[in-house]
From Swiss-Prot:
O-glycosylated. Hyperphosphorylated on serine residues, when in dimeric form. Phosphorylation by host CK1 is required for the hyperphosphorylation of NSP5 dimer. Mg(2+) binds at D92. It comes from Rotavirus A (strain RVA/Human/Japan/KU/1995/G1P1A[8]) (RV-A). Keywords: Glycoprotein, Host cytoplasm, Host-virus interaction, Magnesium, Metal-binding, Nucleotide-binding, Phosphoprotein, RNA-binding. GO terms for cellular component: host cell cytoplasm. This is Non-structural protein 5. Belongs to the rotavirus NSP5 family. Pfam families: Rota_NS26 (PF01525). Residues 16-30 have a biased composition (Low complexity). The keyword Cell division does not apply. InterPro entries: Rotavirus_A/C_NSP5. Its cofactor is Mg(2+). It is found in: Host cytoplasm.
Length: 197
């Protein structure tokens, strides 16, 4: 998030609040070297207190303070303002109030009104392979293997129970003997489980 405050629009306030400190050494506020044509401004606490006390509470608005602590907000605002010592104009202000020469000015101009050209030529390739090896998951390994129930009764004298068949539709089914034997075995297993419970 970027907060820009135009100090030059308040000349009477900025002249009484800020005291200019020019230095060619490394600034503790920004951590970078300051050239001869640049200077940073720092807050004057007495001037700020005098300014805030001179205004009525109804006149104090968001432009005076961006936080609940006016002095903290004022300190943040003033430390963020970088000026040109030759012209005395804030570099963060509008383009019409900037000095005519760009010497000593740190500027970043964004020409967004001309449009943004984006080259969006995307090459996509999708390949689907269905020849994947089936891997056994851990869930399959952790499953309990119950004993298989096999019912083989191929003897000719085995009596089939047709009482619940579907009107004789399966009379010639070759799996009929195995089906009834398996069904009888399942009934016995179910009855045994019920008795055990």
């Amino acid at each position: 998030m970027s907060l820009s405050i135009d100090v030059t629009s308040l000349p009477s306030i900025s002249s009484s609040i800020f005291k200019n400190e020019s230095s060619s050494t490394t600034s503790t506020l920004s951590g970078k070297s300051i050239g001869r044509n640049e200077q940073y401004v720092s807050p004057d606490i007495d001037a700020f207190n005098k300014y805030m006390l001179s205004k009525s509470p109804e006149d104090i608005g968001p432009s005076d303070s961006a936080s609940n602590d006016p002095l903290t907000s004022f300190s943040i605002r003033s430390n963020a303002v970088k000026t040109n010592a030759d012209a005395g104009v804030s570099m963060d202000s509008s383009t019409q109030s900037r000095p005519s020469s760009n010497v000593g000015c740190d500027q970043m101009d964004f020409s967004l009104n001309k449009g943004i050209n984006v080259s969006a030529s995307l090459d996509s390739c999708v390949s689907i392979s269905t020849n994947q090896k089936k891997e056994k998951s851990k869930k399959d390994k952790s499953r309990k293997h119950y004993p298989r129930i096999e019912a083989d009764s191929d003897s000719e004298d085995y009596v089939l129970d047709d009482s619940d068949s579907d009107d004789g539709k399966c009379k010639n089914c070759k799996y009929k003997k195995k089906y009834f034997a398996l069904r009888m075995r399942m009934k016995q297993v179910a009855m045994q489980l019920i008795e055990d419970l």
